[in-house]
A protein has these predicted regions:
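C-terminal substrate-binding/catalytic lobe of Rossmann-fold NAD(P)-dependent oxidoreductases
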Residues: 1-75
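NAD(P)-dependent Rossmann-like dehydrogenase/reductase catalytic/cofactor-binding core
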Residues: 59-109
Length: 109
């Protein structure tokens, strides 16, 4: 579910689903999967759009409520969106470091 709020840029999403797997196993799977992804970060704390604005980062938080898993994400759709993805893909295609030109926080916003 994408959320619309009082913000000019960024995307906040939320996923809820029934879940009957082990909590620690699930957290471990997510941690292992994103370990080598330079722009995706798992957070134990509440996530906020301000943390990702003007960056190519995506923050993910996983919570469990009885038999429900709740995954929330935040990203800046103007950088992590199409433009940042294009730069990241070109870096991979041409053999450059995946994060080349993307590890900065813009000074304007």
């Amino acid at each position: 579910v994408p959320y619309r709020g009082n913000f000019t840029r960024g995307i906040f999403t939320s996923i809820y689903m029934k879940f009957d797997h082990e909590i620690e196993d699930t957290k471990s799977i997510y941690k292992d999967f994103y370990e080598n992804h330079p722009f995706t970060f798992l957070s134990k704390n509440d996530i906020n759009l301000k943390e990702v604005i003007n960056t190519n980062k995506c923050h993910v938080k996983i919570e469990f409520h009885e038999s429900i898993i709740h995954i929330t994400t935040v990203l800046d759709n103007l950088l992590k969106g199409a433009s940042g993805q294009a730069v990241q893909n070109l870096n991979i295609i041409y053999g450059y470091e995946e994060s080349l030109g993307l590890n900065f926080k813009g000074s304007i916003y």
